[in-house]
């Protein structure tokens, strides 16, 4: 009896304090986790099936994302693909172009609706981050991309002389901005992607000398950090037509981290979605590869990976069928490495020549 009375008293006290908190800070200020309307984190596709798989479904909505890597590794391409996917679902996207380097033609080729894409090219880092904060607080924008953190120059640095030292200004700016923005991001459900560059630390003997710009705040606030690297140049003969890139999920708060994905980025076209599909279909056993030949249900469909991609491109219904089967296999728990290295260079080219002869 004493236990029941004690429990009843605690429950009354809990109800009173919860009501008091809601009166003081508004409804929803505190809740039981089981009552939350969004238990499962919704995701945005990156345009690359292998990367979506490595991320546990895609980029999480309502979170801070950091994409970093060397120059020309595909950072902006991945971000633009995410924008295109959001727009396909009827969402509103914004691009804060601090580098003043956005190519509308390339963005359009990737599927971005440039007519409805909100673009800002601010002069200072403070202006850029204030614009981001206002967009996020509006709850009207679904995704904001900042390109890049390195280009968010503090106002004091712009107004000062060229040789002036401004130690830690950008790091303090990022730390303050993220403290303000993060809470609003969670409430609005807006995804904020920061593109970042790499720098070399001086005097490092052990470990990697590489570091990202803007201090450590972004590393802590980001739910997902993607390290993207170019590992191979794709060629047809002597002509270069794209890059093979490897993405390591350096941090992931919503799925297992440290997974690796590889995919092709074609110059002028973006991520090769069909290339990703061929890789995953092969790994899940839907497409069988013997030597250079790809077969489906015992029938040869193409010789070489490039021709397999071309075959799927020419037959969209078959491509959709393969995609559906791949998703079904993955939903059933099929284990894939998500990082098949494309063998689409010399071997395929030689075999294509033999076939023509």
From Swiss-Prot:
SUPFAM superfamilies in UniProt: P-loop containing nucleoside triphosphate hydrolases, RecA protein, C-terminal domain
Q: Which InterPro entries match?
A: AAA+_ATPase, DNA_recomb/repair_RecA, DNA_recomb/repair_RecA_CS, P-loop_NTPase, RecA-like_C, RecA-like_N, RecA_ATP-bd, RecA_C_sf
- State the disulfide connectivity: none
Keywords, A to Z, come to:
ATP-binding, Cytoplasm, DNA damage, DNA recombination, DNA repair, DNA-binding, Nucleotide-binding, SOS response
SMART domains assigned: AAA
**Cellular component GO terms held in the UniProt record:** cytosol
Where it sits in the cell: the answer is:
Cytoplasm
Protein name listed in UniProt: Protein RecA
Provide the species name: Nostoc sp. (strain PCC 7120 / SAG 25.82 / UTEX 2576)
């Amino acid at each position: 009896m004493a236990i029941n009375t004690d429990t009843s008293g605690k429950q009354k006290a809990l109800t009173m304090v919860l009501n008091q908190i809601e009166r003081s800070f508004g409804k929803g200020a505190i809740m039981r986790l089981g009552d939350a309307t969004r238990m499962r984190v919704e995701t945005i596709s990156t345009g690359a099936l292998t990367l979506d798989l490595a991320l546990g479904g895609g980029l999480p909505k309502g979170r801070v994302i950091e994409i970093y890597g060397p120059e020309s590794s595909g950072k902006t391409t991945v971000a633009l693909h995410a924008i295109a996917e959001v727009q396909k679902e009827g969402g509103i996207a914004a691009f804060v172009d601090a580098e003043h380097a956005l190519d509308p033609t390339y963005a359009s080729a990737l599927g971005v609706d440039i007519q409805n894409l909100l673009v800002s090219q601010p002069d200072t880092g403070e202006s850029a981050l204030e614009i981001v904060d206002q967009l996020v607080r509006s709850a009207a924008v679904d995704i904001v991309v900042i390109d890049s953190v390195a280009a968010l120059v503090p106002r004091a640095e712009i107004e000062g002389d060229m040789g002036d030292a401004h130690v830690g200004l950008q790091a303090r700016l990022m730390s303050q901005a993220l403290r303000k923005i993060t809470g609003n991001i969670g409430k609005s459900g807006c995804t904020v992607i920061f593109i970042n560059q790499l720098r070399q630390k001086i005097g490092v003997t052990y470990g990697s000398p590489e570091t990202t710009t803007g201090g450590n705040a972004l590393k802590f606030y980001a739910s997902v950090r993607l390290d993207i690297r170019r590992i191979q140049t794709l060629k047809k003969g002597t002509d270069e037509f794209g890059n093979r890139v490897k993405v390591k999920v350096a941090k992931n708060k919503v799925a297992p981290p440290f997974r690796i994905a590889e995919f092709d980025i074609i110059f002028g076209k973006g991520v090769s979605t069909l290339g990703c599909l061929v890789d995953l279909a092969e790994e899940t056993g839907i497409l069988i590869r013997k030597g250079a030949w790809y077969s489906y249900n015992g029938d040869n469909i193409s010789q070489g990976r490039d021709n397999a991609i071309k075959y799927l491109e020419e037959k969209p219904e078959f491509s959709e069928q393969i995609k559906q089967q791949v998703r079904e296999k993955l939903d059933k728990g099929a284990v894939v490495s998500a990082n098949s290295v494309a063998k689409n260079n010399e071997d395929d080219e030689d075999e294509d020549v033999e076939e023509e002869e």
